Amino acid sequence: MEPLEFHSGKVCPLNRANVDTDQIIPKQFLKRIERTGFGQFLFFHWRFNDDGTERSDFVLNDPDYKGSSILVAGDNFGCGSSREHAPWALADYGFKVIIAPDFADIFYNNALKNGILVIKMDEQQVKSWMQKAVDGLTLDVDLKQQTIQASDGTITSFDITPYQREKLINGWDDIALTLLKEEKIAAYESAN
């Protein structure tokens, strides 16, 4: 997992509440176990027509939002069935940060475990950023300071547990954390 201490990116507004994991990555694309290659299927039924052409009315197909790396979404993002493929698809597409008023618990934890910074933010602030995204809003997200500075100069703070913050800043996934204790594990195993 790549360390994430600071990220500056363009905002893509997804003004929808209750976006579930099947909408994020439909079930027909879950047959693979590698973590890469899922970005092309992100929001598949919203992004593409039945004939495979892009739908011009979906935000990810809008040229103004190409290259966005911060997704600002509606309430209860990531609800529905538990599937780790959802954060894989978001990360593979290029999203590093997702901001919403609330997240489904399992999605929230899966996203953090896969290196995506998920930030719970006041609904009024989320709506404000969605509106400003039309004018090319960028956000500077400082995980160390736990602040977000918008391109209009406003600064907002956010909360994250110290444990999750340290994991993201250092790029530690669960395996990396286990390997940090390799000597203690080996000592325990040799003693028992």
Swiss-Prot record:
Its EC number is 4.2.1.33. It catalyses: (2R,3S)-3-isopropylmalate = (2S)-2-isopropylmalate. It is an enzyme of class 4 (lyase). InterPro entries: 3-IsopropMal_deHydase_ssu, Aconitase/3IPM_dehydase_swvl, AconitaseA/IPMdHydase_ssu_swvl, IPMI_Swivel, LeuD. It comes from the Bacteria. One of its GO terms (molecular function) is 3-isopropylmalate dehydratase activity. Pfam families: Aconitase_C. The keyword Membrane does not apply. Belongs to the LeuD family. LeuD type 1 subfamily. PANTHER family: 3-ISOPROPYLMALATE DEHYDRATASE SMALL SUBUNIT (PTHR43345:SF5), 3-ISOPROPYLMALATE DEHYDRATASE SMALL SUBUNIT 2-RELATED-RELATED (PTHR43345). Catalyzes the isomerization between 2-isopropylmalate and 3-isopropylmalate, via the formation of 2-isopropylmaleate. This is 3-isopropylmalate dehydratase small subunit. It comes from Oceanobacillus iheyensis (strain DSM 14371 / CIP 107618 / JCM 11309 / KCTC 3954 / HTE831). The gene is leuD.
